[in-house]
Amino acid sequence: MKRFILLAIATVFFFCQFQTNPVNALELDEATRTVALDETGKTTIVTSKQITNGQRLFVQECTQCHLQGKTKTNNNVSLGLDDLAGAEPPRNNVLALVDYLKHPTSYDGEDNYEELHVNVTRPDLFPELRNFTEDDLYDVAGYVLVAPKLDAYWGGSIYF
């Protein structure tokens, strides 16, 4: 009898592991999802679906070098909004980041990095982005611009 009760309790605990409620996506307000579209100051509102897709693609393909918005190869330049704004040309808007993912350049804009940084222009060198669509690039750029609003340590801090 004791074994039967223990088996019944174990069975209930086992099945409770699978009876979870579906997780709802984090609902972000419109202000959080509003990012710069271009250098003229136009803005766009990124959808939650775009942010989710951008995050998935970023984690899948970019975090090897850009974990939490930092840059593994150069700790002085991150994906924080201040660093993106300080680049030449500024990369603190969606269209500039999409352009960078197509034609990467150095932080000062002087050198072409198409053979050094992952991009969609050279799938022969960087197959990671081979299947990225224009929408995927837009989603990743949107995520990179929304991420600092969600994580105070995105791009690094004086402590990390």
Curated annotation (Swiss-Prot):
The keyword Disulfide bond does not apply. Coiled coil: none annotated. InterPro entries: Cyt_c-like_dom (IPR009056), Cyt_c-like_dom_sf (IPR036909), Cytochrom_C550 (IPR029490), PsbV_cyt_c550 (IPR017851), PsbV_cyt_c550-like (IPR016003). Binds 1 heme c group covalently per subunit. It comes from the Bacteria. One of its GO terms (cellular component) is photosystem II. One of its GO terms (molecular function) is electron transfer activity. Its main location: membrane. It is found in: Cellular thylakoid membrane. Its cofactor is heme c. Heme c binds at residues 62, 65-66, 117. Keywords: Electron transport, Heme, Iron, Membrane, Metal-binding, Photosynthesis, Photosystem II, Signal, Thylakoid, Transport. One of its GO terms (biological process) is photosynthesis, light reaction. Residues 1-25 form the signal peptide. PSII is composed of 1 copy each of membrane proteins PsbA, PsbB, PsbC, PsbD, PsbE, PsbF, PsbH, PsbI, PsbJ, PsbK, PsbL, PsbM, PsbT, PsbX, PsbY, PsbZ, Psb30/Ycf12, peripheral proteins PsbO, CyanoQ (PsbQ), PsbU, PsbV and a large number of cofactors. It forms dimeric complexes. Belongs to the cytochrome c family. PsbV subfamily. One of the extrinsic, lumenal subunits of photosystem II (PSII). PSII is a light-driven water plastoquinone oxidoreductase, using light energy to abstract electrons from H(2)O, generating a proton gradient subsequently used for ATP formation. The extrinsic proteins stabilize the structure of photosystem II oxygen-evolving complex (OEC), the ion environment of oxygen evolution and protect the OEC against heat-induced inactivation. Low-potential cytochrome c that plays a role in the OEC of PSII. This is Photosystem II extrinsic protein V.
